[in-house]
Every structure is written in structure tokens, then in C-alpha cells.
């Protein structure tokens, strides 16, 4: 299989880098890459949001602030490259064609953000579409897709299996709310829909066992194309 992993920045670096987690997923990714083609996109998470918030004191330029976030995602990506060692391509990959070339070299391409206005979820979905991946695995700080925000609603129900059309609907509903924070943003959901990409959305606990996740053994949400 060809698999794209979308690792949330807040999972990798919640406040400070989670060294044990980074070691664990690096081990899992190397193991998976022995039998499958693997590409990874890393997010900026809380650290990126802090920098972007600070930048608001100095500039109203949204594109400039997006670039700040992109640089943070690439710093996180470099951390994972270091953890993966020789199995990873030694530089942060910045475009999809290069990711394809790296895969042909039997290495793991690691990407961060690419363009202003695109989240790393959107980048991962586009990369999966470009590579014609068999599977997209989204690792987030929520253990799947819920029918409402579980941080605000203790009775929120996790959805074990949904269609991509449902994912788009849920993402758009969350995005329309003030402060809404769905597990996947609406643009990424639409790219998943367009690319007809089978997607697993899992939490940090499952991410310690990515080798099992790709076999469908997880407690997250399956998104059917």
C-alpha cells in the first residue's frame, strides 16, 4: 500500500516535544515502510498558534502569519526526520513532485506546510490525492470524529464509520462556529472527498500502534470515500 500519515503538531509537540511519542511513531513508521510506501505531513499545532497569535501584535498581514506557521511545521518535520534517521529523506520536502521522487528512492518524505491558506491537513489530503495513496491516516488530539465537540459536550458521540460526504458536512458545521475546531478542516475534507481517499482519523493513543492502525485495528473513525 501507499500510505500518507498526517501527524498533528499538537500531538507531536503538545507544549514541548514529546520525545517518547516521537520515538514510538518513528519506530512504527520505519516498520511500516518495510512493506509499504510511506509519506508524512507534520502540523504546527499549539506552538504555531502561539507564534501566529504573537504576530498579530505586529502585523495584520494574514499571509505573513501563515508563513510563520509554515516555518513552525517544518521545524516539527525536521524533528521527526532526526528521529527516523537514515530511513527519512534528510531535508523537509516542500512539494508533491519531490515527495514522489523521494518515495522512488525508498525513503520517507516528510513535509510540513506548503502554501499560505492551506492547513497541513489540506496538504496531507492533496499529497494523498497526488500520490494516489491507498490510505490517509490523520493523527489528531481527538480520538476520532464526533457528532459534536467532545470538549464542550460531554454527551458527544464518537462516530466509528462515516462517509466522506458526512465528513465534509461535519467539518463545515464546525468551521461555521465561532472558535470551532473540528478534527479536519473543511478544505481538507473537500480534498479527501474529491480524491476519494479512504481515511482513518485516530487519536494519540492509537498512534503508538500505527502498524495496527493501517490494518484497521484502531478506536478512531473510518471515513469511506
Swiss-Prot record:
GO terms for biological process: 'de novo' CTP biosynthetic process; UDP biosynthetic process. SUPFAM superfamilies: Carbamate kinase-like. ATP binds at residues 9-10, 45, 49, 140-141, 146, 149. The keyword Cytoplasm applies. It catalyses: UMP + ATP = UDP + ADP. One of its GO terms (cellular component) is cytoplasm. Its EC number is 2.7.4.22. Inhibited by UTP. It is found in: Cytoplasm. Pathway: Pyrimidine metabolism; CTP biosynthesis via de novo pathway; UDP from UMP (UMPK route): step 1/1. Pfam families: AA_kinase. UMP binds at residues 44, 66, 114-120. InterPro entries: AceGlu_kinase-like_sf (IPR036393), Asp/Glu/Uridylate_kinase (IPR001048), Uridylate_kinase (IPR011817), Uridylate_kinase_arch/spir (IPR011818). The keyword Zinc does not apply. Keywords: ATP-binding, Cytoplasm, Kinase, Nucleotide-binding, Pyrimidine biosynthesis, Transferase. GO terms for molecular function: ATP binding; UMP kinase activity. Belongs to the UMP kinase family. Catalyzes the reversible phosphorylation of UMP to UDP. Homohexamer. NCBIfam families: pyrH_arch. This is Uridylate kinase.
